[in-house]
């Protein structure tokens, strides 16, 4: 069953960008053209800080757990950390496998880049790691005060990447699927690591 799930996820990631048509460029063009200093500043802030948030949260959890000698918090930090790092590594591999051109490069007359990226477009690494962070936190702490901010955060990251002109809708959808999928895999990996490190 797990093999079939992995097959369908990989198939989705390879085929989706190939099937995407001009509707994606039009959607990015629409979002990319939103006016106002708030949306510009908010989007820029979310995009620039996402990698630091994704890595910083599990590191802070680990530091606090170590200082307080809280083994459960250390286990949680390991789960969140492996989810984020594993997702990022997988996303980078898929990026160069698919090698999709960025929206602002493919449609320079239609989409204005608010930021510039050097790697390929699909999937969105920012969205993938944000979803990995949010999903792992929600699995470990299934409370409304964790779930609600997490949902707002991942939505903001996904939208900001399209506003910046650096991703298509299927890029962020692929990133979201990858983040959730890798986190589920990390859930089982962290169980094995916990036995080796803490038991």
Which sequence ranges carry the predicted segments?
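Small-polar-interrupted transmembrane alpha-helices in polytopic inner-membrane proteins
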Residues: 82-96, 148-160
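N-terminal transmembrane-helix/juxtamembrane module of multi-pass inner/ER membrane proteins
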Residues: 12-59, 92-119
């Amino acid at each position: 069953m797990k093999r079939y799930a992995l097959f369908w996820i990989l198939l989705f990631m390879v085929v989706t960008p190939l099937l995407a048509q001009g509707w994606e460029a039009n959607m990015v063009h629409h979002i990319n053209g939103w006016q106002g200093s708030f949306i510009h500043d908010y989007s820029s802030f979310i995009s620039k800080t996402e990698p630091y948030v994704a890595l910083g949260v599990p590191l802070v959890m680990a530091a606090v757990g170590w200082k307080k000698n809280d083994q459960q918090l250390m286990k949680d930090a390991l789960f969140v950390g492996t989810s984020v790092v594993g997702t990022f590594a997988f996303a980078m591999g898929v990026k160069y496998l698919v090698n999709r051109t960025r929206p602002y490069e493919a449609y320079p007359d239609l989409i204005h880049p608010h930021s510039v990226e050097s790697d390929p477009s699909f999937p969105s690494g920012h969205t993938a790691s944000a979803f990995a962070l949010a999903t792992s936190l929600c699995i470990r702490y299934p409370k409304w005060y964790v779930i609600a901010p997490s949902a707002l955060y991942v939505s903001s990251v996904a939208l900001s990447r399209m506003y910046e002109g650096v991703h298509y809708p299927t890029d962020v959808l692929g990133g979201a699927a990858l983040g959730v999928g890798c986190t589920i895999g990390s859930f089982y990996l962290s169980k094995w690591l916990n036995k080796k490190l803490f038991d």
